[in-house]
């Protein structure tokens, strides 16, 4: 095949740092993979990770759990959301996010997003007025950060609890404030394709002592909460202990040992991702029928993937994506009629009540998604650009 072709799989995962490998080996040598115990050494890996996250964000508390989905479920539950309550959710998100709400027995009400994949503030206000929600679970899906000043103002004005899904924005900020710090809690993911790769895991950050205590207890502390990295006061723990079921959502020692060293090098990886993103954006700008969603000036993003919107009929998009795939650049498309890996959208979720989402549906119809390993070279990015230009440049 003549012309550009990417030889390196975009699904490849950069190597773990040596410190993560050493930490994992130490855990395996000890055979202590469970975070709690009646006779445990001081400073378990999970407790150290919790302290490191709290220090990184400047929060009083961080709670480590077994997945980003569990983090959202526990944050909502611990903030006081109960079965039957309405929880708003922006329509551009991934299945684990409405799944966390459904897991709680609450009702998902979707909110429209604009052409740049950010929550539409007018529709958010309309949904608040109409549905009187208990909470808004704001998903910073694929790293697209909303107008947080507007979101916070609406939530505060109407008494709506704000929980942030920051699975794709560890290291991003709005107006100098990191995502995860705008509401009652921020929820992060440690899944392989995120900024920190522990295979699976989640972190809740919060300054709310009651929320932290409830999350620790519900995650399954076995009354060994004093071994937690950022423990709330005993009075607050005892207030909630009789009322809180053990949902068994703890993070394990192996995942924490792998994750902890990666937090120290987070900004280095995010800088690499930003350079990759900017080079790709610059390379495809000006292509016909194709645009890149705009990032707000107040936002410092932390992209792990790249999105663009194509204004073509479905068959035209399909044909061009086939060209890209043949040349080693597989591109996901949110506009497919059926759900595929990591790209399901609201119309695929039969458990969520349908609602008119004209702006979101218009952008999702042509939304394409490219995974970006953080160690892509400039030459590899240029090859991706060349393949996309070959496919879409006519």
Predicted regions and their residues:
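Conserved PLP-binding active-site segment of the aspartate aminotransferase-like
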Residues: 294-296, 303-313, 342-352, 365-377
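Active-site phosphate-binding strand-loop segment of PLP-dependent enzymes
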Residues: 116-198, 203-213
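Conserved PLP-binding active-site segment in aminotransferase class I/II-type PLP enzymes
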Residues: 1-69, 73-78, 156, 364-365, ...
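Short, conserved charged micro-motifs
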Residues: 313-320, 376-382
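Conserved PLP cofactor-binding pocket of PLP-dependent enzymes
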Residues: 223-235, 279-283, 320-357, 362-367, ...
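Active-site region of PLP-dependent enzymes
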Residues: 169-175, 182-304
């Amino acid at each position: 095949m003549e012309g550009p072709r990417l030889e390196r799989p975009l699904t490849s995962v950069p190597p773990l740092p040596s410190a993560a490998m050493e930490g994992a080996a130490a855990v395996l040598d000890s055979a202590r993979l469970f975070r709690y115990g009646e006779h445990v050494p001081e400073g378990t890996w999970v407790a150290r990770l919790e302290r490191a996250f709290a220090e990184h964000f400047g929060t009083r508390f961080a709670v480590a759990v077994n997945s980003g989905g569990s983090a959202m479920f526990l944050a909502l539950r611990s903030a006081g959301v109960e079965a039957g309550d309405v929880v708003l959710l922006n329509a551009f998100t991934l299945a684990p996010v409405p799944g966390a709400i459904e897991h709680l027995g609450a009702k998902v009400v979707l909110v429209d997003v604009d052409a740049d994949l950010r929550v539409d503030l007018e529709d958010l206000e309309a949904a608040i007025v109409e549905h009187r929600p208990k909470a808004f679970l704001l998903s910073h899906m694929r790293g697209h950060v909303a107008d947080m000043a507007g979101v916070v103002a609406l939530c505060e004005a109407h008494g709506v609890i704000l929980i942030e899904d920051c699975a794709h924005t560890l290291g991003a900020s709005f107006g100098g404030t990191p995502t995860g710090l705008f509401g009652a809690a921020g929820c992060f993911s440690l899944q392989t394709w995120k900024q920190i790769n522990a295979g699976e895991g989640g972190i809740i950050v919060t300054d709310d002592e009651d929320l932290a205590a409830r999350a620790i207890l519900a995650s399954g502390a076995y009354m060994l909460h004093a071994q937690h990295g950022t423990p709330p006061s005993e009075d607050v723990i005892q207030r909630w202990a009789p009322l809180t079921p053990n949902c068994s959502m703890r993070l394990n020692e192996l995942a924490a040992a792998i994750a902890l060293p990666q937090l120290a090098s987070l900004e280095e990886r995010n800088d690499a991702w930003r350079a990759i993103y900017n080079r790709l954006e610059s390379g495809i700008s000006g292509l016909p029928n194709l645009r890149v969603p705009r990032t707000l000036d107040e936002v410092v993003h932390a992209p792990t993937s790249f999105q663009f919107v194509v204004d073509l009929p479905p068959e035209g998009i399909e044909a061009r994506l086939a060209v890209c795939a043949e040349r080693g650049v597989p591109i996901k498309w949110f506009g497919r009629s059926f759900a595929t890996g990591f790209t399901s959208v609201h119309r695929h979720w039969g458990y969520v009540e349908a609602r008119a989402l004209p702006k979101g549906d218009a952008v999702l119809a042509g939304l394409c998604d490219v995974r970006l390993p953080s160690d892509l070279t400039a030459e590899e990015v240029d090859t991706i650009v060349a393949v996309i230009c070959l496919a879409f440049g006519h």
